[in-house]
Amino acid sequence: LDHPGLILADAGDTLEHYFRKIGKPFDQLTFTPDADGVIPVLDREWFEDDIVARTRDFLRATFGVGTLEENVRFIEESLGKDLRKYFMTDFYKDHLQTYKKRPIYWLFQSQKKGFSALIYLHRYTRDTVNVLLNGYLRDFLHKLHSRIEHLEHVQATSESAREKTAARKESDALKKTLRECEEYEREIILPLAQQRIELDLDDGVKVNYLKFGKALATIPGLAAKEED
């Protein structure tokens, strides 16, 4: 919005690179890239800078606040579902199809999709997984613990049978998500963060993507022996 063409296209590009290329001070920018390059994709608004919030920010900056809800409604009607459901279920499949299974956005995702977050390949650095771990995944685990504690308090104190039932169902579901994400953190993300993997974009998406194993969403056929 502030400069024609693709701005962040070199390996390890940061916001500092963006500001230098744009040539404008921060307070004059129409829209800025995500500060840390990690965007949560979750089933509800657990984070203020999740993908739905960032999408709304982009629409607001592009078309104005006065038409924000109208534009969101138009997009959701075109998609046949709300923005959050689209990003949770269809966005990455569409992205893989567009880029022929060589994505420029990578989806970190636990086994049963309890936790998901997108990164942009060209903004990846050796510390990106640490940012995801300490800035998002562990914070998400803390939020899950807090929500479960609240729901258990509701079950213990509420006089409404309906409220107790709803709290129990949500609590049971969140406990499953918590166990899944704790395993993802312990067995997969923490070891990767400690490795501080470096990428060579000249090797191609396939070679680099496979370095992250089960940390990333599976791309059918990517690991097969085929020409890159």
Predicted regions located by residue number:
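Terminal accessory regions of large proteins
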Residues: 1-228
